[in-house]
Amino acid sequence: ATHFTHWFQPLTGVTAEKHDSFISPAPDGRVIMEFSGKELIKGEPDASSFPSGGLRATFEARGYTAWDPTSYAFIKGNTLCIPTAFCSYGGEALDKKTPLLRSMQALNKQAMRILKLFGNEDVKCVRTSVGPEQEYFLVDKEMYEKRKDLKFTGRTLFGAKPPKGQEMDDHYFGVIKPRVAEYMADLNEELWKLGILAKTEHNEVAPAQHELAPIYSTTNIATDHNQITMEIMQKVAAKHGLVCLLHEKPFAGVNGSG
């Protein structure tokens, strides 16, 4: 890796990152590659253009990223990605990770209290786990380019009803088409490289709808992995001349993605 980034999840619905190189100037005019503990623990991205839910005025632009040591760092290309929380100067949460970590902490505290009331004095910690299934649609890129509603909104806004509705049960768990199987194989390989344990894949109910299910893991790690998964799904689809639609209801009259 030549760069690092504090990888965080602002209130935009997607992840954010700013890449900094490991290059630092040496006293003799040369450069060295180094990475300090300060750079690992904290970053200061400009937060003025991120949504804040009305917590602060735009001119109060300073935001901080803080390392989340409970989630694994990963390498994407030539960049070391460090999962972080994102907060304002006053400590208000500006992301989706901070409330999640706080809720996990609160649940741990109250669950331990209840367990000890029932006489379990040996418990040290209560951890929650999640295994989010990711449903998605695959559309041929040439067909996708002809639909401006799909390009701009990620879903269709007009069109005729499908010839069949909920009767399309023959697609559910059906034989996976070769082109889709190749996509799934490449997707699995890319996910496994990053330590994301993709386990199950199959056709879903609607035409061109499919599902990927990972092995359960700790809640905040599973959430980070799901964000990475959605990003990689779209990148791998492009390599196969496909477009991966992650909108929960891209087509009227057929099943959406749950």
Protein language model annotation of sequence segments:
Residues 1-62:
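Active-site core of metal-dependent hydrolases
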Residues 62-246, 255-258:
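Glycine-rich, acidic/polar active-site loops that bind/position phosphate-bearing ligands
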Residues 5-7, 34-35, 213-215, 245-247:
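A cross-family glycoside hydrolase active-site/sugar-binding cleft signature
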Residues 14-15, 43, 208-209, 254-255:
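Short secondary-structure boundary/hinge segments and terminal tails
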Residues 8-12, 38-39, 86, 142, ...:
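Active-site-proximal loop/turn and secondary-structure-junction residues that shape catalytic pockets
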Residues 20-21, 156, 249:
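Flexible, active-site-adjacent loop/turn segments at secondary-structure boundaries
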